[in-house]
């Protein structure tokens, strides 16, 4: 056990953790030199250059004549996946903190770092990409020293591209990170930190043993669900899975026991023996709560069941996705899905498209609201269509977040303007180093879900980074904004918005829809309404044929007769005609600027 080291890598998006991980794997001869990131195995992860799922891999390394086992648990860096990070961190004793030499400390670096410090991990700071021309290792060292309070000589300079500093990192992992603690003779206690779905073997759970021993064929049970299984196969994770007869305290491995549904494997759950269970679960397990909700509808109504099957399969290795059936007048049957955030939502959409070939329409994303009626009863609403009658409502509460934005001093003005427009209130600002500031805001989550992140990046030329934590619910003056096409409400376009922004938003939505809905044979009125009050209107004129073309010279009354006839026809058409709203329109409404 004292020859095992479990560690993870903490970094902001794009600071090069997956590349550096590749170098560590090559150096310890775990893999041959290959193309691209080994640990990001989804196509989507490689394309976007982000890590979505946590991964684990075991390396063997001989140091000063002794053989050590190093378990690297890779973590995602994006704010949407912070629960994945927290579970990976809980399975480790140490962490490599990677900071980009040209970008310095970013918001997510800090939030994941605090998580690691809460779990008492040994932190090894590394400055990556030191071979770049734009690298500023001295300034970044100052920031790290100020952040961690460590000594300068504890910071390792490295480069994932050239492989510089890799040997020092491995030496530091062995010397500075403590070996796992635990008692082999105690009852089995193991933490699940990830699960993947394999269509032949069912669900494979990855775990780390904190106490006890597990052998193949043991009867085990999962603590929080209380279900029992037989451990058909256990083993360790190298580039592929290597079966073993037994795993002992401190080991990181996998278990296959023919589990078919993801709901039974909850990440953060504890595995123990049926015959000799441990007293209590490992602390820190929490159900992941989705933050952003959107309707997902199949384009063809008969694909509803296929969509359900696809979502269930996605849920197998993405436990944070939730969904329940709902129906909409405009779009038919579909699902109301809960996501961790906007990136997560985009990824789920892309995976539906790529892995299951499903074409879907997604509605405007929104958050969950607490609605109190006059009697003081609370209902939770994820969907503007579920809003009760406005006369019954006493007040509405919406979720708030505490946001931290790190930026250079040049962009403070525009960023503050953006946050004010999103109803944010500045709590405080702190200077991290000479020209970098951290701004703390309280903001409604609903204002952020649509385009906040994109706009923050474009205002600050990509220099601002953003991170947030939920901060409870607060009362707010919200109204339901409906969009009517020819007097019929399109429920998929309804949104809940703050009263102060409603007029502006209604006007912009009408203008946007006017551009996107194709002209029909009859005229279309696009209206935005709050309750019964119309607040904005645009009209799409009808396409019409020149019916008087065949009258040469001729009498005006003859022409008038033909025009009247055409007008009647158009009127009749308008009564029975329905308006096709293209998918583009649903998406464009999300990104109003």
Curated annotation (Swiss-Prot):
> Keyword Cell inner membrane: yes or no?
yes
GO molecular function per UniProt: GTP binding; GTPase activity; ribosome binding; translation elongation factor activity
Q: Name one GO biological process term.
A: positive regulation of translation
Domain tr-type G, residue spans = 2-181
The answer on whether this UniProt entry bears the keyword Electron transport reads no
Q: How does it sit in the membrane?
A: Peripheral membrane protein
Q: Which keywords, in A-to-Z order, does the entry hold?
A: Cell inner membrane, Cell membrane, GTP-binding, Hydrolase, Membrane, Nucleotide-binding, Protein biosynthesis
| GO CC terms of this entry | plasma membrane
Q: Which reaction does it catalyse?
A: GTP + H2O = GDP + phosphate + H(+)
Protein name in UniProt = Elongation factor 4
Source organism of the structure: Bacteroides fragilis (strain ATCC 25285 / DSM 2151 / CCUG 4856 / JCM 11019 / LMG 10263 / NCTC 9343 / Onslow / VPI 2553 / EN-2)
């Amino acid at each position: 056990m004292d020859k095992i080291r479990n560690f993870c890598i903490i970094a902001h998006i794009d600071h090069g953790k997956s590349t550096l991980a590749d170098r560590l794997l090559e150096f310890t001869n775990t893999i041959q030199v290959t193309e691209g990131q080994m640990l990001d195995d989804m196509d989507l992860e490689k394309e976007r250059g982000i890590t979505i799922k946590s991964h684990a891999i075991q390396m063997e390394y001989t140091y000063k004549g002794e053989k050590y086992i190093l378990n690297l648990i890779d973590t995602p860096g994006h704010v949407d996946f912070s629960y994945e990070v927290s579970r990976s961190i809980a399975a480790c004793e140490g962490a490599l903190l990677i900071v980009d030499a040209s970008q310095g400390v970013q918001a997510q670096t800090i939030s994941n770092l605090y998580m690691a410090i809460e779990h008492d991990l040994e932190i090894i700071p590394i400055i990556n990409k030191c071979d770049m021309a734009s690298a500023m290792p001295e300034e970044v060292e100052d920031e790290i020293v100020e952040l961690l309070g460590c000594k300068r000589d504890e910071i390792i300079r490295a480069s994932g591209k050239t492989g510089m500093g890799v040997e020092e990192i491995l030496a530091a992992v062995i010397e500075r990170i403590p070996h796992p603690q635990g008692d082999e003779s105690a009852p089995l206690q193991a933490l699940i930190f990830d699960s993947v779905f394999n269509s032949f073997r069912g669900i494979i759970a990855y775990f780390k043993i904190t106490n006890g021993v597990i052998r193949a064929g043991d009867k085990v049970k999962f603590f929080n669900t209380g279900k029992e299984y037989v451990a058909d196969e256990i083993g360790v994770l190298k580039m592929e899975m290597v079966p073993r007869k037994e795993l002992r305290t401190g080991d990181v491995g996998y278990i296959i026991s023919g589990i078919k549904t993801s709901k039974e494997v909850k990440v953060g759950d504890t595995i123990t023996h049926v015959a000799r269970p441990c007293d209590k679960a490992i602390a820190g397990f929490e159900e992941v709560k989705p933050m952003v909700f959107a309707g997902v509808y199949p384009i063809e109504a008969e694909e509803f069941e296929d969509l359900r099957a696809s979502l269930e399969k996605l849920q197998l290795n993405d436990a944070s996705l939730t969904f329940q059936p709902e129906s909409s007048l405009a779009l038919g049957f579909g699902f109301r899905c809960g996501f961790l955030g906007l990136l997560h939502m985009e990824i789920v959409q892309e995976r539906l498209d790529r892995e299951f070939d499903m074409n879907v329409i997604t509605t405007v994303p929104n958050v969950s609201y607490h609605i109190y009626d006059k009697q003081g009863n609370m209902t939770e609403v994820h969907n503007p269509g579920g809003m009760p009658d406005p006369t019954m409502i006493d007040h509405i509460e919406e979720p708030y977040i505490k946001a931290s934005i790190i930026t250079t001093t040049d962009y403070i003005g525009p960023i503050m303007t953006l946050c004010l427009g999103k109803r944010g209130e500045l709590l405080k600002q702190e200077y991290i180093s000479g020209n970098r500031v951290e701004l703390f805001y309280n903001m409604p989550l609903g204002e952020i879900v649509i385009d906040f992140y994109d706009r923050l990046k474009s205002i600050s030329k990509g220099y601002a980074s953003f991170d947030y934590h939920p901060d409870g619910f607060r009362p707010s003056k919200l109204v339901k904004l409906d969009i009517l096409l020819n007097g019929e409400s399109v429920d998929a376009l309804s949104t809940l918005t703050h009263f102060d922004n409603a007029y502006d938003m209604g006007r912009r939505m009408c203008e946007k829809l006017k551009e996107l809905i194709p002209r029909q044979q009859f005229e279309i009125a696009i209206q935005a309404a709050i309750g019964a009050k119309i607040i904005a209107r645009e009209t799409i004129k009808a396409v019409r044929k020149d019916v008087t073309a065949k009258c040469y010279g001729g009498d005006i009354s003859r022409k008038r007769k033909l025009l009247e006839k055409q007008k009647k026809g158009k009127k009749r058409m308008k009564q029975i005609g329905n308006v096709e709203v293209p998918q583009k329109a649903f998406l464009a409404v999300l990104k109003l600027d």
